[in-house]
Amino acid sequence: MKAAPTLSKQLIFQYEHQTADFNMDELVQSAARVIAPLWPIETFAARHPWMGLEEQTFEQTARQLKQQLHVDIYPKSSIFRSAKQRGEIDETILEKKLINWLDSHQPGMQRETAEAFCKAALKLDEIPGQLLRSRQVKKLAKQAARGTIDGRKTSFIKPLSVFAGQKSAHLLDHHVIKWCKLFLDESQSAWRLPHREKGFYSAWRQLVEHDPALSRAERQRLNGWPEEPRDAMKKALRAFDISNADVQAYLEAHLLSLPGWAGMMLWRSQQSQDEEELLLEYLAVRLSMEWMLVEPYLPLPKPNPEKEMQLVPLIASWLHWGGLTPEEWLELSAAEQKARLTLARRFDDITRRRLWLEAWEQTYAAEVRKLITANKPAAADKSETVLAQFAFCIDVRSEPFRRALEKSGPFETYGTAGFFNMAIETCELGTKHSHSSLPVILKPQHRVEETAEELPFKSYQEHKKAAASLSSAFKTMKQNLLAGMLLPEVSGPWLSLQMAARSLVPRAAGQAFRNARKTWLKKPQTKLSLDRTETSEAGIPVGFTEEEKAAYARQALKMMGITDRFAPLVVICGHGSRSTNNPYASALDCGACGGASGAFNARVLAALCNLPSVRERLRSDGIFIPDDTVFAAAEHITTLDELHWLYVPELPAKAQQAFDRINSVLPDVSRTVGAERLEELPQLGYQNPRNEVERFAEDWSEIRPEWGLARNASFIIGTRRLTRGADLEGRAFLHSYDWRNDEDGSILSGIISGPGTVAQWINLQYYASTVAPHYYGSGNKATQTVTAGLGVMQGNASDLLAGLPWQSVMRSDDEIYHAPLRLLIVIEAPDDDIERLLDRDHSFRQKAENGWIHLASINPEGKWKNWTNTINE
């Protein structure tokens, strides 16, 4: 296994002068592995917090974060106890895992003694604080420290501001946050940071000497400070006496101090060559201000590394779980004491909770296995042929809707990535703003614009400008000192009426405002710029060539598995959500479309598949779409459990019959899915499920309009035969795949590298926000502040919060809703295909090998195989 990144490197502070130069750019790039890019909240995209650390195991990362940051990424004991009470953890599996652990660790004592101790410790009850504070236990620890077990002689590097006192560390974060907000502001403030165009460090350098928040002495310290960020970093590091070998670890510690703001800087540096040094400049500002704050205290006293293991909790564990008395402990020989201390150290809290988590995950995997292997789909009615086929996003919220839709009639459903393999940038009618409607790990290759006839478009544009002018005038008055005083008088009556309506009758008010806006704007019928016309300002071609049209259609159909037996009507279903007063609205939309609705992509694909020229080219690839098959586009509104039609061309008789049948069953499907979903949402009771669902979407005081992707736990890649009719409880990403149509394995590789990666990121973001909400979550929605148009903070001086609010993962203050399980990926394919995938895809193999995902497969004979254990053998 490869060596772990330097986050895991244990270091002693070495107060020595630099003896050699180093490449600062390379060190910053390497240090950036400990953080993840953070996208603006308007295009909220799931982020895997530990994506740069997958070269090491999940447990190694957990230990390092616990020791360096006091951040625990294993679920706490109370979460496991609750899961056990709900029957989600099989104790038999837990016991087997303990036996396996003991078999692989020679305890150096009688097996019965070791097993009894570990079983008692595995109950997860806390050692009483009185015992840990006991003088007698401390005396025993002092005696045992004389050579029974090696002590820790190292410590993790931390910013020097930490050792200068909590005040210095807090002030450093406070100042850095302030400058980040000023530099990154996206049009929220009326005042723009001077010299911003020169870069973050240069702007800071020219303005910091005038910062009224600094004392005169602090400002004077920065007189003559280097103009170049690399020189500033080197000067600060030399002043701190950080050795060359420790520089990267020191930079990592600073990045981890504010991972949200650092993550935003990292993301910005990856988007434009103009800002490619932004993360380096961020570190230069941070180190410069750290030097300014700690310079009076230099040289700081050398931190005292731990010279011995903290034996108190180890001895206390044997008194508590091992049933020993202090007298019995003293009767043990030195070798016996050492063996017991070694076992207690190895079977520590992290090891115990690792076993609990793995038992929980294996219990869930066993349930999925039982559901799949025992699933016997109802035989299709031979008298009723398939009327329509639906392609849904793999999103876990699609699973209940697909299940209900299939039960309602002769329909087939398929799962694929919600951007439908369309690497496009979209531009809606009447706006210059474009959106990259694809996963954030990809870049758009084509631009598609909405167009309309000149006269209706002109009217629409005028109405839209009028609405925008009103909004702009309101914002201008709000930010102007004198006009702001008049604003309450001018806007008070209207805003009071709006507040009363939205508070007292949110459902009716929301619908009324929506209808009024729609009536006022009068958006005309639109077309899509499918034909290649020009190149956009960003250098992206607008529209497609004939070959590109066919290539996109071919790729999408193959990825979703619809290449033959076409129904009269094929519906491409994007998905989006609807909520009010919700800064996390984009988190409820399609993650595969960059935190937006997949409606635009669905329209593009459906339109391409209806083109005769595209169908003609597809025939040469063996994909024969019947002349009477029509593609339509719809949007699955997850907050309302509704399907809204977006694009329905002229329909021949059979397709019209299918369309009518779909419309007749959709109300019942919506009611069924809505009632199922409402049972999981905290609410005070309701009489009409449909009205309650609409209220959740329109109520601006609603902190939880829907659960989003909470409780996601598995990603199943295979034919619908595996899961059709099975109730997966909205916890599974479902991607259609038939290994028989994938001879070279390219389709499976594409699924794993694309949708599989996005699903893993989603899974680990929900996981992190649940187990460590104070560090990886974003706190309470009710107390959040939208900051600089970029993201949210708690108050006005916190880190930029990268994760999900507790309302997205918690049922109440004391009860979690999301089960923090690492993603289980199940692939329907022969063993040889899985081995080929693992041999080709080193990154995917590494994820499974190091415990970032779990991998299982089902072969053509229906046999289940757990690959995670096989890989590690």
Swiss-Prot record:
Its main location: membrane. GO terms for molecular function: zinc ion binding. It is found in: Cell membrane. The keyword Zinc applies. GO terms for cellular component: plasma membrane. It comes from the Bacteria. Its cofactor is Zn(2+). The keyword Cell membrane applies. Zn(2+) binds at residues 393, 395, 575, 590. InterPro entries: DabA. Coiled coil: none annotated. Part of an energy-coupled inorganic carbon pump. This is Probable inorganic carbon transporter subunit DabA.
